A protein has these predicted regions:
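Extracellular polysaccharide-recognition and catalytic grooves
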Residues: 2-20, 26-254
């Protein structure tokens, strides 16, 4: 985790904290020590894209769609949530990296299932029954699926107004709605049902919002034009019920 998440993030953050000095170093200005520091920060930050090794052909070309598919370390939350991918792409001024991230973010907002496992873009994340997988086919509804999709949406938010702007397609919308609807079945009056993620057996007597509350707010705040008027009404009703920790959605329940 340190080699691909924490240390590269620290390196890229340090780089941008001293951006003027880094620009000088890359422009051939400054002393040898500054240039070496800049090179080292860029080398370490790139580990967000290179580590851990997959021991396949993608290790030779990390800026590839196949790098972000069919491996537990490179899909869902482990792909997009904990790695400083976009900052590193900006650090390297890499158009191919940003091209790739825009595509991965959009295609990652999708569903998988037992029957589509080999063909789905990601082998984990949202599942067709409205639940979710993480670290393979483990039932981790409230962790990796939300983390991966939330950060995909956040990156797409940042790319709005740029040449890399993407709209949510109907497949994206259907995957999101399916998860919002399905996830509500695993939550009751402020409490997550047991056996659904890594922390669901921890005793907590306090009511908490459903874990996808932040993602729902993001959709309503930034992506409402991707939904039909009827879907927008459904999302707004869900948001009101989420705020009360009482999700019934009686108008929409089967």
């Amino acid at each position: 985790h340190a080699s691909c998440f924490a240390i590269p993030t620290a390196a890229v953050n340090t780089y941008f904290c001293y951006l003027k000095q880094m620009d000088d170093a890359e422009g051939g200005k400054g002393g040898t020590l500054l240039q070496e520091a800049c090179d080292m920060l860029k080398t370490i930050a790139l580990q967000a894209w290179t580590q851990p090794l997959r021991h396949d052909e993608t290790d030779e070309n990390v800026v590839s769609i196949s790098r972000f598919r069919n491996h537990v370390w490179w899909v869902g939350g482990n792909a997009l949530a904990y790695r400083s991918l976009l900052p590193v792409a900006a650090m390297y001024r890499s158009i191919p990296m940003i091209d790739l991230l825009a595509e991965v973010c959009q295609r990652g907002i999708s569903m998988t299932s037992q029957t589509t496992y080999s063909d789905a873009f990601w082998t984990e994340g949202f599942t067709a029954d409205g639940a979710g997988w993480g670290h393979g086919k483990q039932c981790l509804i409230w962790g990796y699926p939300i983390d991966g999709t939330s950060n995909a949406l956040k990156m797409l938010n940042m790319l709005k107004g740029s040449p890399w702007a993407k709209n949510l397609g109907r497949d994206n919308v259907q995957a999101l709605l399916n998860f919002l609807r399905g996830g509500a079945w695993y939550y009751y009056k402020g409490y997550r049902l047991p056996c659904l993620d890594r922390g669901s057996y921890v005793y907590n007597p306090t009511e908490l919002s459903i874990p996808y509350a932040g993602m729902l707010d993001n959709l309503i705040g930034n992506w409402m034009d991707s939904f039909t008027p009827e879907e927008q009404r459904e999302l707004l009703q869900l948001q009101q019920e989420v705020k009360k920790n009482r999700i019934t959605m009686e108008t929409y329940a089967p």
